[in-house]
Amino acid sequence: MDEIFVELKKLGAFAAFAWSHAPADNYGVIAIDGQNALRAGDKTAEKVPEGTIDWFTRSPASTVPGEVESLLDRLGASWYLNSVQYESDTGLLHYEWVWQYG
């Protein structure tokens, strides 16, 4: 699972996280939200971490969404694009992916 964090940091925008009252033009957030478990024979056979990747940008031409999806495919993660929204309070486009990897 750490591989997702390492690879996202290589994209650049995920390299540093800082709190600010004025949002940056482009930034990403990755979170682990929980896990899914496969049960077999009344026991947990496998556990897979699940999380979200959020990308915020002012540019509708941002290449990062495609890079995130290519990265998740390359790592063999299960994922889907959950939503793309315009955040009217910040003026940012917000992409959200849900992923499972393990």
Predicted features along the sequence, with ranges:
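Short glycine-rich, basic-tinged beta-strand/loop micro-motifs
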Residues: 45-57
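A common structural junction motif
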Residues: 12-13, 71-79
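Small/polar-rich, solvent-exposed N-terminal microdomains that initiate assembly or binding
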Residues: 1-39, 60, 64
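Short beta-strand-to-loop capping motifs
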Residues: 55-59, 99-101
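Short amphipathic alpha-helical segments, especially helix-boundary/capping motifs
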Residues: 27-29, 41-46, 72-73
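A broad, low-specificity signal marking well-ordered, structured residues that form hydrophobic/aromatic
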Residues: 28, 51, 97
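Short, charged interaction patches at domain edges and termini
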Residues: 3-7, 14, 33-48, 82-102
